[in-house]
Amino acid sequence: MAYVAVPAVVDSRSSEAIGLLESFGVTATKEESDVQYQDHDYVLDQLQYMLDGYEAGDVIDALVYRNWLHESVYCLLPPKSQLLEYWKSNPAVIPESVDRRLRKRLMMKKDLRKDDEYNQLVRAFKLSDVYTPLVSSSTSPMTMIQSINQNQIVYSTTDRVIGARISLYAPRKYYSATLSFTLNRCIIPYGKNVAPIGHARFNIGTFPSLASPKCFVLSSVDIESIPNEFIKLFYQRVRSVHANILNDISPQLLSDMLQRKRLRVSSPNERKIAQIMHLPYHVKRGATHVDVYRVDVVDVLFEVVDIKDGLRSVSRKLTLQTVPVSVIELIGLETADYCIRKENGMFTDWFLLLTMLSDGLIDRRTHSQYLINPSSIPPDVIINIYVSGFTNRRVIDVMPEMYDFVKPIGAVLPKGSFKSTIMRVLDEMEVLGVRIMPRCHVVDSDEVGERMQPTFEHAVMEIYKGIAGVDSLEELINWVLGPDLIPHDERLGKLYQSFLPLAKDLLAPVARHFYEESLSEGRLLTFAHADSELLNANYFGHLLRLKIPFITEVNLMIRKNREGGELFQLVLSYLYKMYATSAQPMWFGSLLRLMICPWLHMEKLIGDADAAITSAEVGWHIPKEHLMQDGWCGCEDGFITYVVIRAPKLVLEELREKNWGQYHAQVIVTDRLEVGEPRRVHARVVIKGNHMPSKLISRYACFSLTMRYMMHLTCGHSIGRSSAYGARLVFRSSLA
């Protein structure tokens, strides 16, 4: 059996359910054994009743996990005193688990109100000792749903429940008049059985469910057109909060299922549905529908070549893992000899990009992980290599599960991780007219410390001199580092004990203000040295703890003109590593592959097509009438780009039909002009409610991971006043 959610309530007849499906574009079979409708009228009553005492979000977030294919019921118990009266009148229904002394008293045909032993037994008696599972007015909605998903009968002391009908344990006269019996559609009279769920192939209900992979939501639903406000509220929250784990099913695919046809699938999601249902399928091939987030990668085999006195020798054989084929083709890498250093000893840009995009190196002799020494001074340095081959070609998904919503990205890398160099390389990359990662889209946690007077690193330096009892920075370095530049554990521990309050009391307050300000100015990439920096600053973006295949401490030692010198930076590096959480790092390449590879893939698909029909933007829309009230010219509506999209024309046409307007924000259009062309003013965006789920943008389309918020001005008129507006997302393209 499968469950399909459709946002409407009809009578509990298969013919009505079939008509409902057809109204949403589904060609349904006329066999009533195929389709069964679950009447969820009573759930609407429960929702309305529950919202008086619980947060709407808590109730909806719980109900979305209800397994509607599991038969269950709440059994409403009378108040304890009335329950005992019922037992006294009907001794045969007293449960076996009741204390035998209490059972014996209840079977006596006399007035027990003045029986001291009976009253003592009553006071000791707990409903939870006899009836399990038991929910009450203090039970959370999620616990209620978990209970009815796992049991056929859940006992309750309250009628304020959600997700299943209520069956009366006793005749109605035993219940308090204060209990609400206005919920007639929820209450099953005493002695009447619950109608069983039919054994149809498809059960149609009102509310989406995440309880099982076989629970689907019809994708052709227009949320804004749902007439019932409670159902509309439910769908709006589920679509915004749980969008990435909902199982959408298209009318065409459901039609094929109902008509018992071989399924025609055209996307990874549809293929997944066919596999879940164990149904045969064939893939509809289309050049326009290519999953650009599935990327070909290989392992690059190379040898470290040493040349001495004209003689060539191989000192080490390495494997560079999980390198994108598209980047290898972009660089033009072949089986040949390469010098990977510039004249100044630094790595070439292409080698740095290649290694950063990888999942590290393996020494083929020891089969252990190998870290590259950034120094150009022997021993154990790499200057010349010979690429000997490519192996283990495979396909990987570069869209991580954690990137569920379109939000800023916090990238945590240790000091000495070549951030400046790799950002310079990415700043120069442009694909399909879109810059991969403009430098203005990147902020660094160092900027927080540099805003302080004195700077954070200078303040730390002066305080550490006092802890070490020295006057100079050189003496401080000698005090904490040994001759081999490895810190003395006890002394480094003393410095760390003072580092924590400095980071908490000095750095964190400034950081909170900095990130609140910078993240309202754009969906930016933020670099930090420790994830604790961002966590303590209430950073709300995706947080990625990353690592690179280089010895970062050595890179620190060869960088000059840093605060306190390279040795003090080394000490700070040790402290930041201690400051970090215990979360396991992932390779920096996993983020870089997401930034670069889909765009290179898309370029192959649409590189020769007209840019006007393969380009689109999603942004915040402000009607020109609102702008004119604040002195703007009103030549056109205001539009602040949120996401830049490149995709084939047919994919853009599909994206155009999606419900973008369900996401809203407060947009502050400033009077601060950006230098250069085109003419733009800066804007700030504070998103209200939920961020846009990444799933809303098709896997057949590329979108910008970062964005600086600007409002474009197509005219030369004077600018207006800085003002705030309520705005919703709209889709904009040149398509007719």
From Swiss-Prot:
GO BP term (any one): symbiont-mediated suppression of host type I interferon-mediated signaling pathway
Highest taxon of the lineage: Viruses
InterPro entries tied to this protein: Reovirus_Mu2
Disulfide bonding pattern of the chain: none
GO terms assigned for molecular function: structural molecule activity
Keyword Secreted: no
Keywords of this entry: Capsid protein, Host cytoplasm, Host cytoskeleton, Host-virus interaction, Inhibition of host innate immune response by virus, Inhibition of host interferon signaling pathway by virus, Inhibition of host IRF9 by virus, Interferon antiviral system evasion, Viral immunoevasion, Virion
Main subcellular location of this protein, as a coarse class: virion
GO cellular component, one term: viral capsid
Subcellular localization: Virion; Host cytoplasm, Host cytoskeleton
Any one Pfam family match given in the protein's UniProt record, by short name: Reovirus_Mu2
The protein's required cofactors: a divalent metal cation
Function (record text): Minor inner capsid (core) component. Displays NTPase and RNA 5'-triphosphatase (RTPase) activities. ATP is the preferred substrate for hydrolysis. May function as a cofactor of polymerase lambda-3. Associates with microtubules and plays a role in the formation, structural organization and morphology of viral inclusions, where the assembly of cores and the replication of viral RNA occur. Together with mu-NS, recruits the other core proteins to these inclusions.
Subunit text: Interacts with protein mu-NS; in viral inclusions. Interacts with polymerase lambda-3; this interaction stimulates the ATPase activity of mu-2.
Family assignment from sequence similarity: Belongs to the orthoreovirus mu-2 protein family.
Name listed for the protein in its UniProt record: Microtubule-associated protein mu-2
Classification of source organism: Viruses, Riboviria, Orthornavirae, Duplornaviricota, Resentoviricetes
